[in-house]
Amino acid sequence: MSQIDKLLTRLVRTPAPRDFTWQQLVKVMTHFGYEELEGSGSRKKFVNLRTKHKVLLHKRHPDSTLIGPQIEDIIDALKSQGYIS
């Protein structure tokens, strides 16, 4: 099982992981063709340059782990684009 497969398995498990980091999210999103772009302040967006699909998120600080609603938004976005089922 590849590292991306392991990260995806952790991302979609129930209950949502409490220790999924921003760096792990960047790896997953990059795998699906998304690029991380800076917004104002802690706002970040992932844009798929091929499909122009955007995922808008707030990067928490100083702790960069994702919280439940962020994980749900990411899962919904990836499902809507057909990247995960």
Each language-model region and where it sits:
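Basic nucleic-acid-binding interfaces
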Residues: S2-S40, L49-S85
